[in-house]
């Protein structure tokens, strides 16, 4: 999950888990669940449409600002749904990090952009321009095929977005083949 009992993933209670995953050479998939603020999003399927991307962004920011990528440098982590809103809010995160280090950089002195390429995201973003942006920002070697199957927002024909995105064959091959292998450590 993207949180555990509403605790961010950088909470002290979870450090033994991440240390064990790194020591055992395991891959970790972070998928949103139990979205924050659900009680305020009762209509229009907003927990699924707005809450899930926000929840994944929360998890990814917990990893970055909480120093988990530095603490566990060999840990292979993939964030579902293209990393949520992370890429779209990266400029804001960077700005917050630089203008309010007293609030943002308290557990990690490195800017959020320094972690681009340090984690994987899946391709399930439902939009070819967003997928292209992920590849541009993270690199094709950090985007893996995602479908969100069997959930209702899942891609009905897994791989359709990647195959019809206009990305070249080499990039598509990375998303379908070499990037997932690298994330899985095979």
What are these regions (language model features)?
Residues 1-138, 142:
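Catalytic pocket-lining loop regions of alpha/beta-barrel enzymes
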Residues 75, 121, 128-144, 150-186:
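Mid-to-C-terminal alpha-helical segments outside catalytic/metal-binding sites
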């Amino acid at each position: 999950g993207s949180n555990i009992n509403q605790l961010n993933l950088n909470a002290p209670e979870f450090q033994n888990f991440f240390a064990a995953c790194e020591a055992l050479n395991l891959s970790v998939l972070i998928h949103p669940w139990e979205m924050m603020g659900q009680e305020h999003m009762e209509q229009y399927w907003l927990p699924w449409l707005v809450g899930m991307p926000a929840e994944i962004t929360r998890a990814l920011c917990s990893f970055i600002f909480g120093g988990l990528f530095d603490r566990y440098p060999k840990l292979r982590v993939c964030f579902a749904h293209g990393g949520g809103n992370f890429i779209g809010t990266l400029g804001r995160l960077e700005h917050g990090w630089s203008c309010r280090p007293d609030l943002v950089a308290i557990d990690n002195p490195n800017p959020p952009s320094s972690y681009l390429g340090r984690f994987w995201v899946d391709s399930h973003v439902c939009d070819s321009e967003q997928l292209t942006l992920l590849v541009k920002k993270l690199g094709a070697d950090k985007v893996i095929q995602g479908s969100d199957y069997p959930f209702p927002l899942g891609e009905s024909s897994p791989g359709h977005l990647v195959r019809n995105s206009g990305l070249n064959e080499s990039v598509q091959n990375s998303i379908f083949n070499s990037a997932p292998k690298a994330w899985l450590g095979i």
